[in-house]
Amino acid sequence: MTRPVLVMMRPLPLPLLRANGEEIEVRQFQGDFSLFEGATVLCSTALDRVDADFIAAIPDSVKLIANMGTGYDNIDLVAATEKGIKITNTPVVAEDTADLAFLLILASARQLTANQKFLRAGHWTSTQPATHIGKTAHGTTLGIVGFGQIGQAVARRAKGFNMNVIYHGPRRKPAAEKLLDATYFETLEEMLATADIVSLNCALTAQTKHIINAQTLSAMKSDAVLVNTGRGALIDEAALVDAMNAGHLSAAGLDVFEYEPDIHPGLLELDNVTLAPHIGAATAQCHEAIGACAIENILAQFEGRELISCVDP
């Protein structure tokens, strides 16, 4: 029996893996495509670009790309599908990402970054009122763009803050609406004009790239808060910087960036923007769940079982 071979795009701690009683050989990719000889599975992360050229360079023996993360916009799905390669993801990050989204909602609304900077600089020298006054989050209208697992998890948290939840997406979700007392808006602009706080939780596609741009930003309330824990390229960052410098929007909270780890310098200069280095899934428990999900898909491929989280092409 041929020994099963797994190629890793980056070094990740894995337990000893066996498929059908055979130990899986794990190879670390470092630019040499000859390492793929005899390989059946490639394991990648959201930080690894698996484009059409990369897919063309790997042998036909590769039948699965097991991507670690919910998003898979780093992979050329068309090229993979045409080559007969299946894609799996790890959709186990919803609750942790929703936690971070709500952290950014509260931190941004209450101007935490500006107030922390004020304190750390030693300017808090008396019982004077806070220099940077925030806005109330509870009881406001929260607009969610993308009402999948993560968007709905954000909505569940919002109900605890007595928020009015509205959402926009490519299709209505009546069951989720009823469960979460949420209202669907067919047009993005109408939802943006209604929301006090906007949370981006949709996937990055050709249709959603720069879904927040100069035009849609102008549709938002002038004192609105914008939060993004989806993908950085959902926002035209230059347009966001221009809008905030013009006093449009009271605050923003961003965990993801279009060209991360590079960040638009204008964002770094704004005290009313709370920034995080893509930590939506950065908890020990979530990392463990991601690894377990990826491993289960990898073993399923080697053992001829059904994949647990196969992505539709």
Where in the sequence are the language-model features?
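Oxidoreductase and adenylate-handling cofactor-binding alpha/beta cores
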Residues: 98-117, 140, 156-163, 293-300, ...
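Phosphate/diphosphate ligand-binding glycine-rich loop within oxidoreductases
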Residues: 40-120, 134
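NAD(P)-binding Rossmann-fold cofactor-contacting core
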Residues: 160-178
